[in-house]
Amino acid sequence: MTRALLSVSDKTGLVPFAEKLVALGYELVSTGGTHRVLAAAGLDVIAIDDVTDFPEMLDGRVKTLHPRVHAGLLARRDLPEHMAKMAEFDITPIDMVVVNLYPFKSTIQKDGVTEAEAIENIDIGGPSMLRSAAKNFAGVLPIVDPADYDVVVDKLQSGSIDADYRKSLAAKVFQHTAAYDALIADYLTVAEFPNNLTLPYEKFDDMRYGENPHQKAAAYKTALPEDYSVLNANILHGKQLSYNNIRDADAALRIIAEFEETTVVTVKHMNPAGIGQGSTIETAWDKAFAADDVSIFGGIVALNREVDAATAEKMHAIFLEIIIAPSFTPEAFDILSAKKNLRLLTVPFTTTVPQKLEVTSVLGGVVVQERDLYTESKANFEVVSKVQPTEAQLRAMIFAQKVVKHVKSNAIIVARDGQTLGMGAGQPNRIDSVVYAIQKAAVKSGFDEAVLASDAFFPMDDSVQYAAENGIRAVVEPGGSIKDKDSIAKADELGIALVFSGTRHFKH
């Protein structure tokens, strides 16, 4: 008779599956709570301590860690010496293991959970049985996911369980136990950058393709999800998010989290196209749209206030890929959902993004750093010019600094009164970014109180000179160049304000 060992925390589908195994001729062995559930259902099931001839002990910490269990799992059926040794010790082979693990993840997500509670939910016996079964998949079926129960039964009934399917179940086990261990390691780790980096992710979706149609792609989210994330957004309307949609929406969420004020952010290819602030969400939209009414076409929009009907009517008039907001009024939703392909997402707005490690792939490995969550403040500004910036210019500098950190370096932002006017992004030469940003801004009505912000220092005074000669009256940059004195002298010569923020914001 074939034997199946069942020991599960998640009892979903357990009894029907076990009943079908019995009908297929399986003898059932089980542990603890699983044994009680199966027995209560009227199934003939052998208790694990009747197999091991040893009682469960240490509050259930030791149940299946026994040679009679693991020999039954690890013995190779194709080796006569293995089977002879099994017979010598009267050990029955185990042909199937059905195990899912203690709920460590859900335990540590509970409010007020103690370390002791978390540790008690670290499974030892379960992973050991799964790994033994998965190692010996040629002779043992390892099943870790209740979603596989029906498929396994169908294949057993049809006799279609082949080597490839066995191998796929084994791979699933090792993926599952690796993720389980990674989550535990992450929970217990206190080092900022441990010697071995284990980051558990769970598949969110298979993408139609990646950045381009010839690239395969999938999306994964962290095992402990962040509420403020496009991967945990509520999709109210529209089709599946693409790879590029997710990247752009993520960029929009990162930018808008900088602002408590009523703000609208538009994004194209992960750079802000236009940002506007106003007393209402409609006026904020008007300013964001006016900031760049061309680049916004086919873009992503994020708003940090509820979308009303008036704002929805204006957004409906142009082609957009995604609109993200905390909520939509019923009227706004009706207006926008009339567009079949427009994705409408809700995400709970926050300005408190948690500090996490950012992982970037490079050939042969990854580089890891903290998120850039530096908070801009006038208290950290140093006015280095003779001309003092006005209060309006200082406010614009704070706004522009919050934006420029999210623009691909070399990054320049021209801004005024809660509105971006021009952006220079991704140029290898900083002066080229300065020129482009000012040229973009020049189509707006004048530069009164407009400021220019740079993500990094000016290596020479040409950026200050170009800004001043083209109507900019105040500049903010980190400082730190060996030629800072030249930029300061040029600002004084041309009568503009120059402020050092003291903080660089490269973005690659």
UniProtKB/Swiss-Prot annotation:
Pfam families: AICARFT_IMPCHas, MGS. It catalyses: (6R)-10-formyltetrahydrofolate + 5-amino-1-(5-phospho-beta-D-ribosyl)imidazole-4-carboxamide = 5-formamido-1-(5-phospho-D-ribosyl)imidazole-4-carboxamide + (6S)-5,6,7,8-tetrahydrofolate; IMP + H2O = 5-formamido-1-(5-phospho-D-ribosyl)imidazole-4-carboxamide. It comes from the Bacteria. Pathway: Purine metabolism; IMP biosynthesis via de novo pathway; 5-formamido-1-(5-phospho-D-ribosyl)imidazole-4-carboxamide from 5-amino-1-(5-phospho-D-ribosyl)imidazole-4-carboxamide (10-formyl THF route): step 1/1; Purine metabolism; IMP biosynthesis via de novo pathway; IMP from 5-formamido-1-(5-phospho-D-ribosyl)imidazole-4-carboxamide: step 1/1. One of its GO terms (molecular function) is phosphoribosylaminoimidazolecarboxamide formyltransferase activity. Its EC number is 2.1.2.3, 3.5.4.10. Keywords: Hydrolase, Multifunctional enzyme, Purine biosynthesis, Transferase. GO terms for biological process: 'de novo' IMP biosynthetic process. One of its GO terms (cellular component) is cytosol. Residues 1-144 form the MGS-like domain. PANTHER family: BIFUNCTIONAL PURINE BIOSYNTHESIS PROTEIN ATIC, BIFUNCTIONAL PURINE BIOSYNTHESIS PROTEIN PURH. Belongs to the PurH family. The IMP cyclohydrolase activity resides in the N-terminal region. This is Bifunctional purine biosynthesis protein PurH. The lineage of its organism: Bacteria, Bacillati, Bacillota, Bacilli, Lactobacillales.
